[in-house]
């Protein structure tokens, strides 16, 4: 039985499309359908709003999907987190007009605009506010000051809120896009295997994004010093170089190491000092430990 997977539309879609593509599952989609072809007969995909993903997984109508933890918390859906993909990071924040005396807000009944009705209500009750919530459907930041005293909204940097004359007075939670599965799917042996294999592919892609492969040559007399100075995931890959003349000391060695990208600027000069030559850097597609 195929694994039924939910792909979120909106701002999350682009990163999920790229992740799936790098995992070897390219989305084929035309403008008239919400059911893309992933080129795998064991996968059935459907595109939905991220707000709906958690509840549909809990209902069991789908087996796995992608959404932010913010929408899982908002819906209260009981699902299993499989993997934090780490992108589309946002904070769910409480914001008011910059000129507002936030302490004075507790002396009156306030209007709060938000897409996150449950999260907002929980926060407001815990902090002693009297309130009425107005549900929004996007562009929440435009409601104050005319139509709301406060908003609860998601933000990546806070820049949009600042540009609309708002200040952040509280943070409810921090969210990122995650891969979730339904509890029912994980009880099914075949579907659980599919889910675990997808998670392995996603981890491999995410790990590869953080690393590059460095390939270099080194003469035999400097080989030992170079090897001792190398970082690597496990052990470097080493192969003897062909020495056409058969001279003393042989032809040296070719060495490969997978390293984190942020190590490269300092590492390449270090390798040169240790005697490496012909250093080549190239990207990786997947890294499976």
Where are these regions (language model features)?
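Short, structured active-site "lid" loops
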Residues: 42-63
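Small-molecule-sensing regulatory modules
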Residues: 2-42, 47, 66-80, 84-91, ...
């Amino acid at each position: 039985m195929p694994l039924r997977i939910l792909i979120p539309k909106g701002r999350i879609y682009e990163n999920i499309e790229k992740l799936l593509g790098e995992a070897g599952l390219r989305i084929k989609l035309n403008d008239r359908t919400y059911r893309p072809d992933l080129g795998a007969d064991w996968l059935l995909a459907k595109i939905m709003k991220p707000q709906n993903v958690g509840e549909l997984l809990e209902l069991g109508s789908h087996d796995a999907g992608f959404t932010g933890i913010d929408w899982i918390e908002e819906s209260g859906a009981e699902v299993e987190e499989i993997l934090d993909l780490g992108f589309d990071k946002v904070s769910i924040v409480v914001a008011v007009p910059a000129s507002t005396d936030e302490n004075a807000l507790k002396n009156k009944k306030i209007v709060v605009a938000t897409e996150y009705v449950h999260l907002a209500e929980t926060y407001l009750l815990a902090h002693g506010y009297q309130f009425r919530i107005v549900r929004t459907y996007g562009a929440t930041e435009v409601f104050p000051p005319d139509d709301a005293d406060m908003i609860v909204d998601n933000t990546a940097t806070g820049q949009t809120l600042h540009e609309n004359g708002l200040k952040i007075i509280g943070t409810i939670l921090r969210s990122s896009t995650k891969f979730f599965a339904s509890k029912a799917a994980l009880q099914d042996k075949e579907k659980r295997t599919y889910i675990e294999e997808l998670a392995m592919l996603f981890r491999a892609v995410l790990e590869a994004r953080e690393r590059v492969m460095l390939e270099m040559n080194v003469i035999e007399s400097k080989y030992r010093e170079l090897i001792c100075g190398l970082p690597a995931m496990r052990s470097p890959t080493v192969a003897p170089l062909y020495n056409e003349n058969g001279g003393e000391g042989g032809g040296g060695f070719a060495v490969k190491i997978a390293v984190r990208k942020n190590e490269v600027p300092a590492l390449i000069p270090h390798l040169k000092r240790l005697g490496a030559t012909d250093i080549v850097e190239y990207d990786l597609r997947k890294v499976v430990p």
